[in-house]
Curated annotation (Swiss-Prot):
This is CDC50-related protein CDC50.1. Glycans are attached at residues 297, 339. The gene is CDC50.1. Residues 1-40, 52-86 are annotated as: Disordered. One of its GO terms (cellular component) is endoplasmic reticulum. Interacts with GC; the interaction regulates guanylate cyclase GC trafficking and sensing environmental changes. The chain crosses the membrane at residues 182-202, 474-494. It is found in: Membrane. It holds the Pfam family CDC50. It comes from Toxoplasma gondii (strain ATCC 50853 / GT1).
Length: 524
């Protein structure tokens, strides 16, 4: 391989202070060269020491640093490297096996020694040397070039990792936290968490909810039932006569209804909801068993398909000022406007690319294959006296979902709210907003069409006065307050510990407090 030999070396930055030292080989005619291959460890590169004839013709051992070499007459130069290797013992064992390479260097000031392998012994500077010597190249007895395999002892990966960690720990700088610094940090943390937790709990008091439960059954499938119920301060989380704020949010709450069930969650086709029309039932097989419907003795593809879309929430809410006194039909009450626009229901949510209605001309071209059950126009047969079942259902949806204000068909705000599956069995869907402040009591006119009695479900109307944070903050406030109290206890413990040491005439300097022995006596 040539006249140069390399060996991997890693040292610390302190080793750069060694300049030059003369090296005398023990034999007058060393082999041509020694090649040592060192693999990089942990992604680091290796430095090398090369053996080459010196400028003066002697057998010097110049050092090579990251590709740049400096040759001096019978001298050496040493530099630091950045890769990891094995321990000192393994390299010394290999040196003893090749005496022709062993040289003795002159001591530098009586503190450091340098030998022919490039090993520097420093009492304060730890070194890591590469550990692989796969081959040796030199001249045999006949004078021909010869290469010999050199046995190498590989250390376990875990042992090398631990060795490197020890080397890093021995030369790293670690902060030693004093008791005063930790005490101040804990005190600041306690003040922060206690104050923020108290503020969150106070804000939660400004969050008021008034909940009206109703779960009346409908008379029969597809029919409606009308209710008029009052909402007073007795239905609220705390005693209030007025719900404050610029707007009061109205939510429809469902109980014991699991939208995240696999049979419901995956029963949908997102491409169809985005405006794609499918005429082949095989294209919407994920919606089964609600992928097709028989309309006029013809099997058609449902648009939109799926169990969740077919079971859209259809109860309707209206609000009136005051409460009824006597017969509902004879007591006039002023209605309260309920905002159900898409801007309110779908505030700051990019729904336009996910929910689209197909163009009217595209729907008209495939009416014989696709059943657009949410469209009153596509189900109108042109006869005013008798309406088909499909036409009646579409017109009922148009009224219950408020197509005029909340959008039509798939782009309806109530429908999009319903299609966002909830993670728990009890959930709320935003229904609209009322202008605030709202004086209590108020009346809720409910058109009941969604029957939940078959699975023992629950329904409720919830009026919400939001806090400045927008929702409930009781849990996070309690969590902050608890952690702040824990830090406060730690502060008092450190103060007591510091006071105890001072009474005993000792000085506490760091956190490594030692347990007092039983025989220790307190100083007076």
């Amino acid at each position: 391989m040539g006249e140069n030999s390399t060996t991997g070396l890693r040292g610390q930055a302190d080793v750069s202070q060694f300049s030059d030292a003369a090296v005398e080989p023990t034999l007058s005619s060393p082999p041509t060269g020694q090649r040592q291959q060192s693999l990089p460890l942990f992604g680091e590169e290796t430095c090398s020491i090369s053996s080459a004839p010196s400028v003066g013709g002697g057998g010097g051992w110049p050092f090579q640093r990251q590709g740049s070499s400096r040759l001096t007459s019978r001298g050496t130069s040493l530099s630091s490297c950045s890769d990891a290797g094995s321990g000192l013992g393994a390299l010394r064992q290999r040196e003893d096996s090749f005496p022709e390479y062993h040289g003795v260097g002159l001591p530098l000031g009586g503190k450091y020694a340098l030998d022919g392998t490039g090993l520097v012994l420093a009492p304060r500077v730890p070194f890591i040397f590469s550990h692989q010597l796969p081959s040796l190249t030199g001249l045999d007895e006949a004078g021909f070039s010869d290469t010999r395999k050199v046995p190498s002892t590989y250390q376990a990966l875990a042992a090398r990792f631990v060795h490197q960690v020890h080397q890093e720990a021995g030369n790293g700088m670690y902060p030693l936290w004093s008791a005063g610094v930790v005490l101040r940090l804990c005190l600041l943390g306690a003040l922060f968490f206690v104050s923020v937790g108290a503020w969150l709990i106070f804000e939660d008091e400004q969050h008021v909810e008034c909940k009206l439960n109703y779960a009346e059954k409908t008379l029969q499938e597809g029919s409606s039932r009308y209710l008029l119920k009052g909402i007073s301060s007795a239905h609220c989380t705390r005693e209030v006569n007025e719900l404050k704020g610029e707007e009061i949010s109205v939510y429809a709450e469902m109980g014991h209804f699991f939208q995240n069930d696999a049979q419901v969650l995956w029963s949908r086709n997102d491409r169809q909801l985005a405006g794609k029309i499918f005429t082949d039932p095989k294209d919407v097989r994920e919606c089964e068993p609600l992928a097709t419907a028989v309309v006029g003795n013809v099997t058609k593809v449902l648009h939109p398909c799926g169990a969740l879309a077919w079971a859209v929430f259809t109860d309707k809410y209206q609000f009136l000022e005051g409460t009824p006194e006597g017969d509902n039909d004879q007591v006039p009450m002023k209605p309260i406007p309920l905002n159900q626009t898409q801007a309110v229901l779908l505030h700051s949510w990019p729904w336009q690319d996910m929910y689209k209605n197909p163009p009217a001309e595209d729907r008209a071209a495939v009416l014989d294959k696709v059943y657009f059950w949410m469209s009153p126009v596509d189900n109108d047969d042109g006869e005013d006296m008798y309406k088909t079942r499909e036409e009646a259902r579409a017109e009922l949806l148009m009224d219950r979902l408020n197509y005029e204000e909340a959008g039509e068909m798939v782009e309806n705000g109530h429908f999009i709210q319903w299609m966002q599956t909830a993670a728990l069995g009890t959930f709320r869907k935003l229904y609209g907003s009322l202008e605030g402040p709202l004086k209590l009591p108020v009346s809720a006119h409910i058109t009941v069409m969604y029957d939940v009695s078959s699975w023992k479900g629950k329904k409720a109307i919830v009026l919400v006065q939001k806090s400045r944070l927008g929702g409930r903050s009781l849990f996070i406030g309690i969590a902050y307050l608890s952690f702040g109290c824990l830090l406060t206890m730690l502060v008092f413990y450190m103060l007591w510990k510091k006071w105890q040491y001072r009474r005993e005439g000792e000085e506490i300097r760091d956190l490594r407090w030692q347990t007092k022995t039983r025989g220790s006596k307190k100083t007076k």
